[in-house]
C-alpha cells in the first residue's frame, strides 16, 4: 500500500525573527491534512492514536508525498531537485493526474516522476528556495 503523507509550513520562511533579529526558517510538519476554508489548514499526526498533534499551516505550502525517495530523502510536491539533466520542480499535473518533473534549467517538457534518475537529489523547495528556479527572494 502506498504511504499517504503531506507536509505544510507553520510560518513563512524568514518572516518571524528571534530576539537577535535573525530570520528563522519556516517550520515543516508532516502527517495527514484537513483542508481549511481559507489560508490555513491543519496537518495532524503522531506516533499513537492518543497522541495526535495538530498544527496550523499555510494551505498554499501543503505538498503531498510522491511515494518516491532519493538519496536526500522523501520527495514532495514543491520540491526542487537536481539531476544530470538539470534543475526541476516536482509538480502535480491535473491533465495527466500524476506527479511530474518541470525542468527549469534547461527548460524542457514535463517528465513523469517515474523518469527521475537514481542520481537525482532534492536541493530545496519552492517555498524556502524560490531562487533555485529563478523565483524572487523575499527580503521581508
Label each residue range with its predicted role.
Residues 1-140:
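Secondary-structure transition motif
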Amino acid at each position: 500500500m502506498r504511504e499517504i503523507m503531506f507536509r505544510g509550513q507553520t510560518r513563512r520562511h524568514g518572516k518571524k525573527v528571534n530576539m537577535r533579529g535573525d530570520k528563522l526558517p519556516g517550520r515543516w510538519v508532516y502527517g495527514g491534512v484537513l483542508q481549511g476554508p481559507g489560508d490555513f489548514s491543519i496537518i495532524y499526526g503522531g506516533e499513537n492514536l492518543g497522541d495526535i498533534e495538530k498544527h496550523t499551516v499555510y494551505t498554499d505550502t501543503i505538498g503531498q508525498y510522491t511515494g518516491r525517495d532519493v538519496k536526500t530523502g522523501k520527495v514532495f510536491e514543491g520540491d526542487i531537485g537536481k539531476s544530470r539533466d538539470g534543475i526541476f520542480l516536482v509538480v502535480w499535473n491535473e491533465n495527466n493526474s500524476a506527479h511530474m518533473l518541470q525542468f527549469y534549467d534547461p527548460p524542457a517538457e514535463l517528465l513523469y516522476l517515474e523518469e527521475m534518475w537514481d542520481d537525482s537529489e532534492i536541493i530545496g523547495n519552492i517555498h524556502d528556495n524560490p531562487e533555485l528556479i529563478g523565483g524572487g527572494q523575499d527580503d521581508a
